[in-house]
Amino acid sequence: MTKTKSNIIEESNIFEQIRTLFGLEEDCGFTDEEMQPFFKVIEKMPTLLYNYYTTLGKHQALNQTQDNLVTPKDNLTLFSDPNYFVFYTENQNCCLWAIAKEDLETANPKVYMSTDFTHQHWQVECDTLADFLLAMAHLQAVFALPYAYEGFKYIIPEELAAIKERFPKKPFALHHWLEGADFYGDATDSIAILDKGSQLIYASSSKSSFEAIDSFLKDIGEDM
């Protein structure tokens, strides 16, 4: 697939946001040779996803903390589907995320999710792959980053409004998993609002930034 200038800029920006969030200074990806098992089950892969694998795909905290990036070392037949290429799973496979096979040549395709046992029903989780990679990185961050609030908080609408007023909202979200997930905060932070705006969990890769957000959020909500 030929990259346009805008594709290259967008991809660089996506990866830089993830590196900043996790405090990553070096790439940690699969080699081209290691990626070959994927091409025994699909003919094409979106360049953005391929480059994610070869740039960041081996980072454990980013990709294997709460939910899991499917890797070329996995038994790929476990995730075989006639219409979808599954590349991300919930840690007990209760939820699968995939790209429609008819969209695999698309630069920035939609990402679908399925939670039914037979995985016959799929719905759009994110309108673009870029949004999904960023949203999932921020979801994993609240469990993986070194400075984190231990546990979830239940919040009421007035407290959610205070969070929205205090912190910048990030321009991506998960539409269905966990009853929706929105993200707030600065570049090193993940303030996650889950379950239709009723749950809060947060973390940062920066100690000073965490202390700043914690000073505001620690008195908001009730521990679950």
Report each predicted region and the residues it spans:
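Extended, charged low-complexity segments
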Residues: 178-224
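Helix N-cap / beta->alpha transition motif
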Residues: 71-72, 100, 125-129, 206
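Short amphipathic beta-strand/extended segments with alternating polar/hydrophobic composition
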Residues: 96-101, 122-127, 213-217
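A surface-exposed partner-binding patch
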Residues: 1-119, 140-178, 221-223
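Long, charged/polar, surface-exposed segments that mediate recognition or autoinhibition
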Residues: 120-146
